[in-house]
Curated annotation (Swiss-Prot):
Name the UniProt record assigns to this protein: Ribosomal RNA large subunit methyltransferase E
Keywords, comma-separated and alphabetical: Cytoplasm, Methyltransferase, rRNA processing, S-adenosyl-L-methionine, Transferase
Subcellular location: Cytoplasm
Covalent S-S links between cysteines: none
Keyword tRNA processing found: no
Similarity-based family: Belongs to the class I-like SAM-binding methyltransferase superfamily. RNA methyltransferase RlmE family.
Catalytic activity: uridine(2552) in 23S rRNA + S-adenosyl-L-methionine = 2'-O-methyluridine(2552) in 23S rRNA + S-adenosyl-L-homocysteine + H(+)
Pfam name, any one: FtsJ
A GO cellular component entry from the record: cytoplasm
Claim: Cytoplasm is one of the keywords in the record: yes
Catalytic residue list: 164
Enzyme class: transferase
One term of GO molecular function: rRNA (uridine-2'-O-)-methyltransferase activity
Length: 209
């Protein structure tokens, strides 16, 4: 991509961002990102998080999903968040900064979870996009596979999983793997997800493995 095209694309994104209804609404409500509305919409439809639940939030920074999750889980609940990027503290959220792909970070995350199983695993993880589909899609699929592996390690029976997946190579195989692990799997495209984005959210309930 030429510098000129990249600049035009970046300018378009910035214009969309500042004109975006959800960006303005997130600022008005004190939410850290427009992504918070995605998990809110999923919660409204699927009721994943209830008071007292333990939630793991992968790819948490800047904290939009964690803000919603900790509010829903309440004082008796627990939210454990992880991201390679730093995140300002959120009351009630136990945040671990590190690369989830690294064994030592995974071990540290599992230590924070402890012996008790968790009720919900959330993943809004995405790789740094290069703009090359043949590079970006495998990276994105690797992250969602790691998120599903996390479910296998920590999720309680009948637990739930919400994960961002980019449609493309590997999507159908991944959907099959999620369906094998959960009783019900739904595909959601929240209103707050940009229409031209290939992202969808798989919402899986009734963990059975």
């Amino acid at each position: 991509m030429s510098g000129k095209k990249r600049t035009a694309s970046s300018s378009r994104w910035m214009q969309e961002h500042f004109d975006d209804h959800y960006v303005k609404l997130s600022q008005k409500r004190g939410l850290r990102s427009r992504a918070a509305f995605k998990i809110e919409e999923i919660q409204e439809k699927d009721k994943l998080i209830r008071p007292g639940m333990t939630v793991v939030d992968l790819g948490a920074a800047p904290g939009g999903w964690s803000q919603i999750a900790v509010k829903l889980a309440g004082d008796k609940g627990k939210v454990i968040a992880c991201d390679i990027l730093p995140m300002d503290p959120i009351v009630g959220v136990d945040f671990l900064q590190g690369d989830f792909r690294e064994e030592k970070v995974l071990d540290a995350l599992l230590t924070r979870v402890g012996d008790a199983k968790v009720d919900v695993v959330l993943s809004d993880m995405a790789p740094n996009m290069s703009g090359t589909g043949g590079v970006d899609q495998p990276r994105a699929m690797y992250l969602v596979e790691l998120a599903l592996d996390m479910c296998h390690q920590v999720l309680a029976p009948n637990g739930s999983f919400a994960v961002k997946v980019f449609q493309g190579e590997g999507f159908d195989e991944y959907m099959k793997a999620v369906k094998e692990a959960f009783k019900t799997v739904k595909t959601r495209k929240p209103d707050s997800s940009r229409p031209r984005s290939r992202e969808v959210y798989l919402v899986a309930t009734g963990y059975k493995l």
